[in-house]
């Protein structure tokens, strides 16, 4: 199994961000890069950063099943369950730099709902650099 170094992972992510040819799943690729970077950078926090499988197209039957199980539309893509001096968790919505990559109304509702509690930090990250900056800032002085 090939274990990627941070430098190699970062170089690959930068190269993908600079491609002119559109990717079929740019938000997916961005999220994969971010999760891989986090795993390499913070191995002691393994299992604390996880994805919420809210995206994708589903049949009406599958959507109804998921809703019955408690799935809530608009929940952020990633959740970091680690408190810092101010918040109980970091909620991360992944978007790309594309002009049409915007939060849906349900995502905006979720953001307003959780931030109004004052207990959680919610951020939107459009690049690996955004993600790295937000995570480092959030975890600053607590590890």
Identify the residue ranges that each predicted region occupies:
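Catalytic phosphate/metal-binding cores of nucleic-acid and nucleotide-processing enzymes, i.e., regions
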Residues: 1-143
């Amino acid at each position: 199994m090939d274990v990627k170094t941070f430098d190699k992972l970062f170089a690959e992510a930068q190269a993908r961000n600079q491609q002119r040819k559109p990717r079929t799943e740019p938000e997916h690729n961005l999220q994969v890069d971010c999760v891989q970077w986090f795993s390499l950078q913070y191995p002691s926090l393994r299992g604390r950063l996880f994805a919420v499988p809210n995206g994708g197209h589903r049949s009406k039957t599958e959507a109804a099943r998921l809703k019955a199980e408690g799935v809530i539309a608009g929940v952020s893509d990633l959740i970091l369950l680690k408190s810092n001096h101010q918040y109980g968790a970091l909620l991360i919505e992944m978007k790309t730099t594309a002009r049409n990559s915007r939060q849906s109304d349900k995502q905006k509702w979720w953001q307003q709902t959780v931030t109004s509690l004052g207990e959680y930090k919610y951020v939107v990250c459009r690049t690996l650099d955004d993600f790295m900056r937000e995570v480092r800032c959030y975890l600053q002085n607590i590890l």
